[in-house]
Amino acid sequence: MLTISNNVHLPDAEIELTYIRAQGAGGQNVNKVSSAVHLRFDIPASSLPEFYKERLLALRDSRITGDGVLIIKAQQYRTQDQNRADALARLAELIIAAGKTEKKRRPTKPTLGSKTRRLEGKARRSTVKAGRGKVDF
């Protein structure tokens, strides 16, 4: 059971884990041991609340297939257990991030000090430009 928050949990049956051989350098260990984890999570068929499903499917993430299946590949660590924990943590992190809503920006008005500084600067510039004109003797 993967716990996302106090009231959101994912049963282990909804998360499909397959173990494959990792890529890259590592010599004999990499060639013989299936330490990388391939996690598949079917978003539409999951028991997540609809709000989370909609937000996850709306993400423009290359890890989500056209069918709505999220694929995470974890091969950073040397052991299968560490890679499994990493894949599950990344899944939980993605679901939590999708559940967060951004606060709306409340527009603010310029302060009195900023208005006066702006007007003083304009007045100063005006006198500089006025001094560039023709001079009568």
Swiss-Prot record:
Molecular function terms from GO: peptidyl-tRNA hydrolase activity; ribosome binding; translation release factor activity
Region called Disordered, residue ranges: 102-137
Biological processes annotated in GO: regulation of translation; rescue of stalled ribosome
Record's keyword terms, sorted: Cytoplasm, Hydrolase, Translation regulation
Catalytic reaction annotation: an N-acyl-L-alpha-aminoacyl-tRNA + H2O = an N-acyl-L-amino acid + a tRNA + H(+)
Gene3D superfamilies membership: 3.30.160.20
Pfam families with a match to the protein in the record: RF-1 (PF00472)
Keyword Lyase attributed: no
Similarity comment: Belongs to the prokaryotic/mitochondrial release factor family.
Function noted in UniProt: Rescues stalled ribosomes. Can hydrolyze peptidyl-tRNA on ribosomes stalled by both non-stop mRNAs and mRNAs that contain rare codon clusters.
Name of protein: Peptidyl-tRNA hydrolase ArfB
Organism: Pseudomonas putida
Gene: arfB
